Amino acid sequence: MKTLNDFNFENKKALIRVDFNVPLNDNFEVTDTTRIVSAKPTIIKILEDGGSCILMSHLGRPKGVQDEFSLRHIVNKVEDILGVEVKFVDDCVGPKAEEAANNLNPGEILLLENLRFHDEEKQGDKEFAEALSKLGDIYVNDAFGTAHRAHASTTIIAQFFPERKCFGYLLTKEIESIKKVMETGEKPVLAVLGGAKVSSKITIIENILDKVDHLIIGGGMTFTFIKAQGGSVGDSICEDDKMELALEIMKQAEAKNVQIHLPVDVIAANAFSNDAETQILDVTQIPNGWQGLDAGPKSIENFHNVVMQCKTILWNGPLGVFEMENFAKGTIALGNSIAEATKNGAFSLVGGGDSVAAVKQFGFEHKVSYVSTGGGAMLESLEGKTLPGIAAILE
């Protein structure tokens, strides 16, 4: 696996695919800088070697050229974070971009305009990828967030750098963290899967049953499993058409000696609202008119005990509707348990959408071993898929 450390970038132009797809407010100010901060170590290493950096990224889902999606909006923020002046060119291929790249001196940074202003980027167009490849000497992929897309800048471009392509530090760390959970992690291994729907996690569950010793299932998907086993779930979210599948998963887990832990009690509410009346109920005895919106106190205690005995932990998906304060306790408690286990030497990886948001919101970001930057890419890795952006560097 070729990484940044396999190259010396002195007098070289590094063409880096970063993931600067960051959220902007109405004034076009960056509201979450995580992805820019995550790219910093790669960029700084290249500059310190005596090289220059040409950064390419997408932003949002523009239809053609739309100013609101221009990467020039983020130039100042990128400069603040890197502590280096960032030049900007308002295209990513063609004479303008080539001239700007050619004029770049060692120690300098150039940010190209949004790749997705060209439809060829998402189409994985070979000629477009070749035009991009003219800008640099060494190709560095450091964008885990788009590694599951076979786009021009993430995958197709690598073929134009057969000997001069590598992973940046961020992508290397992502690959190593997933490998640790899925292959080399110290046992017992625990996966915590939450979120609303079983259907979105089926492939992950099937793939990880061979790799884990314990599986905690929480969040909305709980109720499909409970109802499938004959419990009453009231008005809780439930995928009736997935109940047979839930039973099949339970059967597979038993055959593979994986212990599945479901909530035993819930915080139930008489409406989907933070102001609703609530009560603690047995998870199998929720009356009509009530819905489970968070894990209850007994469940929290049970989950804590499971977490504390595990050495490798994957957390994907919250245990309740944490966006509402009254239904955040389960998710916060789980975060505390995982933080404590990590402090005691466990390896913990948090990844996939909502759990990342929860970890940030409740301040666990620096108390776990690693927080993944890729939503869809992380999920596809856990499903056992080879991501095109990663395969393109390994080939």
Please tell me what each predicted stretch does.
Residues 1-395:
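Active-site loop-to-helix "anion-binding N-cap" substructures in soluble metabolic enzymes
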